[in-house]
């Protein structure tokens, strides 16, 4: 008599299992994530293999011949920038983003452009073949060389890959796929993990450049087990406000290029178009005669970007002042307010403080500290900062202004866009001022020096 399947409880966040239901997952600590499921029967012959290409024997690293892997340009400059120059044969890319942000549109455009000189396959698990064809027609794409497969069963997809041997494959999306070897429903942790492992293994063995579309949770993280991001070569996040025409792709992980690289796109009626000069867009409505505004030169991968930081400091009307940020770290705001109080003598304990990075950009680097403080100071005093001025620099707890990486590139970008003055860390001053003839550069080593420059400036 066959044994009845055993009931287990599996965490939807980390994939950990337990025999009894608990309110808190014992593996990752998340609450209310354990879901009842049936334990998979133990197979007689193991089906597990490495998702990397099989190794024949142990060999010394010095004896392995390093071969330069050619890249396949996608034809979309901003996407190639994020990927490090194009797609690599055998690489697996995971693209995540909010629903409706434009993931499927971008990938359909990509493989339509690449179909001119290589075999491509678009696997749709969310739309029918007619829906995909209608979208391609609406975007005005030349889809003659694009092969389409509407399928969610992973074994059928593997058979199609062996028969057609495409060079580029898009799987839209990994959460809709399922394997006959797993009893749980599509989208479960075990299904996502197994399907991704099988597709990754096949991509490595056949040299296929594969792009997996991933859903995101309400917190913005890619849905499914964390191992999904570990097994792929590149993780990209599609960001942007759905009420805005601009979208951004950020490389969180990239084995074949620079991480934190950023690509900017504009959504049009004919699909997504790359933006070669995003700083001009982010500063399109910038006015330097308004209090509470300061331009930051931030660095996204190898690209310097000029972003307007807006601050509003106003009298609080409750017992607890509000501290709200959009596109900036809220914890860092609390730290900067304490530094501003201790080292500049400006107390905001009875003030509401609101910060905004214009254009929907998310800024995480400490180089934004100086621009944030100057914007808050300008709003607090209701006086604009000096005209055509930019700022960048990290601020420490003792009020010192620390240097940041790629200072020369940031200054060149500011001068190119017509700015006349820059407040930077003293250690980031250029060795030769003649390299920046149109830019007055003030180096500061403390927060007090920066405050004095703005106070004595033509504000």
Over which residues does each language-model region extend?
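P-loop (Walker A) phosphate-binding loop of NTP-binding proteins
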Residues: 98, 125
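Conserved RecA-like ASCE P-loop NTPase motor core of nucleic-acid helicases/translocases
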Residues: 120-124
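Divalent metal-dependent catalytic cores for phosphoryl transfer on phosphate-bearing substrates
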Residues: 129
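Peripheral, non-AAA+ core regions of ATP-driven protein-machinery
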Residues: 2-13, 17-81, 88-94, 101-111, ...
């Amino acid at each position: 008599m066959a044994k009845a399947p055993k009931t287990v409880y599996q965490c939807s966040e980390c994939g950990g299992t337990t025999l009894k239901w608990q309110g808190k997952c014992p593996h990752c600590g998340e609450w209310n994530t354990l879901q009842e499921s049936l334990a998979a029967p133990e197979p007689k012959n193991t089906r597990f293999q490495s998702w990397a290409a099989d190794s024949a024997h142990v060999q010394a690293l010095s004896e392995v011949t390093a071969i330069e892997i050619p890249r396949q340009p996608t034809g979309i400059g901003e996407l190639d920038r994020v990927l490090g120059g194009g797609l690599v044969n055998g690489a697996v890319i995971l693209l995540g983003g909010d629903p409706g942000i434009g993931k499927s549109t971008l990938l359909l455009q990509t493989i339509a452009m690449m179909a001119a000189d290589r075999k491509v396959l678009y696997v749709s698990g969310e739309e029918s073949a007619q829906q995909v064809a209608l979208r391609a027609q609406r975007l005005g794409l030349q889809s003659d060389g694009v092969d389409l497969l509407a399928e969610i069963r992973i074994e059928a997809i593997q058979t199609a890959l062996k028969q057609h041997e495409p060079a580029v494959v898009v799987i839209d999306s990994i959460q809709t796929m399922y394997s006959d070897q797993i009893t749980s429903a599509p989208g479960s942790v075990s299904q996502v993990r197994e399907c991704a492992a099988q597709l990754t293994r096949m991509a490595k063995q056949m040299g296929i450049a594969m792009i997996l579309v991933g859903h995101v949770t309400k917190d913005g993280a890619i849905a499914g087990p964390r191992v999904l991001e570990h097994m792929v070569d590149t993780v990209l996040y599609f960001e942007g406000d759905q009420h805005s025409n601009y979208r951004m792709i950020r490389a969180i992980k990239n084995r074949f290029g620079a991480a934190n690289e950023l690509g900017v796109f504009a959504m049009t009626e004919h699909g997504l178009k790359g933006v070669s000069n995003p700083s001009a867009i982010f500063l399109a409505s910038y006015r330097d005669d308004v209090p509470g505004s300061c331009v930051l030169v931030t660095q996204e991968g190898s690209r310097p970007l000029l972003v307007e930081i807006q601050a509003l400091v106003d009298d609080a009307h409750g017992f607890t002042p509000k501290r709200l940020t959009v596109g900036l770290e809220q914890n860092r705001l609390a730290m900067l307010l304490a530094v501003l109080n201790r080292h500049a003598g400006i107390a905001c304990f009875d003030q509401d403080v609101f910060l905004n990075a214009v254009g929907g950009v998310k800024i995480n680097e400490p180089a934004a500290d100086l621009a944030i403080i100057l914007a808050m100071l300008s709003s607090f005093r209701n006086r604009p900062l000096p005209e055509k001025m930019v700022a960048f620099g990290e601020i420490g707890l003792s009020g010192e202004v620390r240097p940041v990486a790629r200072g020369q590139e940031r200054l060149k970008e500011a001068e190119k866009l017509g700015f006349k003055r820059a407040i930077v860390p003293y250690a980031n001053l250029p060795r030769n001022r003649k390299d920046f003839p149109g830019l007055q550069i003030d180096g500061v080593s403390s927060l007090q020096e920066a405050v004095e420059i703005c106070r004595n400036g033509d504000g």
